[in-house]
Amino acid sequence: MSVELWQQCVELLRDELPAQQFNTWIRPLQVEAEGDELRVYAPNRFVLDWVNEKYLGRLLELLGERGQGMAPALSLLIGSKRSSAPRAAPNAPLAAAASQALSGNSVSSVSASAPAMAVPAPMVAAPVPVHNVATHDEPSRDSFDPMAGASSQQAPARAEQRTVQVEGALKHTSYLNRTFTFENFVEGKSNQLARAAAWQVADNPKHGYNPLFLYGGVGLGKTHLMHAVGNHLLKKNPNAKVVYLHSERFVADMVKALQLNAINEFKRFYRSVDALLIDDIQFFARKERSQEEFFHTFNALLEGGQQVILTSDRYPKEIEGLEERLKSRFGWGLTVAVEPPELETRVAILMKKADQAKVDLPHDAAFFIAQRIRSNVRELEGALKRVIAHSHFMGRDITIELIRESLKDLLALQDKLVSVDNIQRTVAEYYKIKISDLLSKRRSRSVARPRQVAMALSKELTNHSLPEIGDVFGGRDHTTVLHACRKINELKESDADIREDYKNLLRTLTT
């Protein structure tokens, strides 16, 4: 493979990348050919890893196409072109351009004799899985040293080599899950506001809520909505730089950048995106350096009119170990809770998933599953997959009897966890009263209201009849239980404290 082939790829892709991205990641690379192998040198490990993770797929795709199906060998190394014969001497103008690019200075020109650098598709925030590529590491000549090259006469050029054999053209991989869209998101009372806010951001970028902060328990659809926004943004503008990542990835990238003295490249990347989508922001808690860096990144993005979407398992003010200035800024936009789905939504989710799987799910069967799996959408979908698999293996239609067989362990656990006894104990602990108070004839508000809450929870979470529930609450009749349920439903609409208490207890009992 010749350097000319590399240059052809560069010319095809040069216009696809913003100048800042090209200067930061691509221009610092040096290239030389040795036989059928093309050696590409990065100035440090951070740049090498970034090129390998973000750009390799597109780069190999172009090399394969321009090579007319040939299987070229490509080596990524740390260091610079070696000066010993028979290799060509390093190109000084290109090295200078690389140094300027890494320092953030603009590069107006590069010597015409300097090998051009390749550029792939837009960056994403996680390693690109490379399929059909055989990768192996060779021993490095030396460990990475930021001071390498300070004295070229004292030490030979250093390189850590990774050889990549191409077996056909590769497709660029996106880390937005393409299956998560607004079209297949099941909307209900529990997520209606969150869905509406996410759509506003996706359909009117830079004019919606910024930041958009979604919070709630696991498996409730926060990540689905986040991916749906990203996918819609890219649908409207395929050239948009939309980055989705988990907060731990942000921390890992920052640590790597600090270790390799490449924090400026890290900052330039994360502050140049059009939309930054970070999942599970609570993992920043008690990570002071990460919070410091994210604080400045967050400010830079909002000042530049770029969209930020965050998720957490709790309300931002409740995240312990998170700096107050971050909590305050998260409140600049819109904060929306995603609640556990109500019965009707759970049934709708099951019916939609069954339809997507081309499976006939009777409505009474969906209702049976939805009544018993209440905690989150993820567990609901998992239960449905088990039922479908059982139906397929047994060669039987889906019925309530088959559901009982396939989910017997899960249903037994649910019945054990969500018993009236457990509800009484949990409610008593929550309100700091005794179980005997719930069963007593006392009518003081401090006891009567928790008793009504416990009765309402018992009706919603168990299969007991109203008379059975009344019997275990001190021998009360079914009309008392019915009145308690109606009263709590009314208070949930008008009393924020009762609504929050009920939600917390429901989450505790079903998670």
UniProtKB/Swiss-Prot annotation:
Its main location: cytoplasm. Residues 133-160 are annotated as: Disordered. Residues 175-391 are annotated as: Domain III, AAA+ region. GO terms for molecular function: ATP binding; ATP hydrolysis activity; DNA replication origin binding; lipid binding. Residues 1-87 are annotated as: Domain I, interacts with DnaA modulators. InterPro entries: AAA+_ATPase, Chromosome_initiator_DnaA, Chromosome_initiator_DnaA-like, Chromosome_initiator_DnaA_CS, DnaA_C, DnaA_dom, DnaA_N_dom, DnaA_N_sf. ATP binds at G219, G221, K222, T223. Residues 134-144 have a biased composition (Basic and acidic residues). Keywords: ATP-binding, Cytoplasm, DNA replication, DNA-binding, Lipid-binding, Nucleotide-binding. Residues 392-511 are annotated as: Domain IV, binds dsDNA. CDD domains: AAA, Bac_DnaA_C. Transmembrane segments: none annotated. Residues 87-174 are annotated as: Domain II. GO terms for cellular component: cytoplasm; plasma membrane. GO terms for biological process: DNA replication initiation; regulation of DNA replication. It is found in: Cytoplasm. It holds the Pfam family Bac_DnaA_C. Domain I is involved in oligomerization and binding regulators, domain II is flexibile and of varying length in different bacteria, domain III forms the AAA+ region, while domain IV binds dsDNA. PANTHER family: CHROMOSOMAL REPLICATION INITIATOR PROTEIN DNAA. Belongs to the DnaA family. Oligomerizes as a right-handed, spiral filament on DNA at oriC. This is Chromosomal replication initiator protein DnaA.
